[in-house]
């Protein structure tokens, strides 16, 4: 979900994804509505969807240039060895969000990612947070990008990227 909300285009939750339905949708049966009240199963996913919607609304970088090439830049799209993608989203105002997604079942420690600017980047989303039912692998809320060029960008940061998770970093200066 963290990847879909940060990537260009609009989001689509289909038939129970927001409650963690494990069965494929079928026109022959209804949704598993009991998952809504199952804190252990669906509670974390519901909290994540609420946070994703709030972050999306509050970060113009994620929506203001959805149909413009100037609103998106790949950081890394070819790291098949680590099963990761990283990209940037931009708003005309200067608002910038970096999204790093790990599709592997293992965390990546010290994973270097290029960023356009040095300074403080706040970790505004970590889908592996314990509040969503994850393991809590993260970056303690913020990272400091240093003047180490990486991925063709002027700065970079070393991250803890959670397993099967997404991390969003928002530039704060």
PLM regions: where:
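Carbohydrate-interacting/catalytic domains
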Residues: 3-13, 17-173
């Amino acid at each position: 979900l963290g990847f879909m909300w940060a990537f260009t285009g609009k989001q689509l939750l289909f038939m129970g994804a927001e409650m963690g339905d494990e069965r494929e949708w079928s026109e022959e049966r209804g949704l598993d509505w009991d998952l809504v009240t199952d804190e252990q199963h669906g509670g974390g996913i519901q909290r994540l969807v609420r946070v994703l919607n709030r972050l999306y609304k509050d970060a113009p970088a994620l929506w203001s240039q959805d149909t413009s090439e100037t609103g998106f830049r790949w950081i890394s799209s070819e790291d098949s060895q680590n099963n990761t993608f990283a990209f940037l989203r931009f708003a005309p105002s200067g608002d910038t969000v970096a999204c790093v997604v790990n599709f592997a079942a293992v965390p990546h420690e010290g994973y270097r990612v290029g960023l356009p600017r040095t300074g403080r980047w706040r970790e505004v989303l970590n889908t592996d947070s314990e509040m969503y039912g994850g393991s809590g692998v993260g970056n303690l809320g913020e990272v400091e990008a240093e003047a180490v060029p990486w991925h063709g960008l002027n700065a970079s940061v070393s991250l803890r990227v959670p397993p099967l998770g997404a991390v969003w970093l928002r530039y704060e200066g």
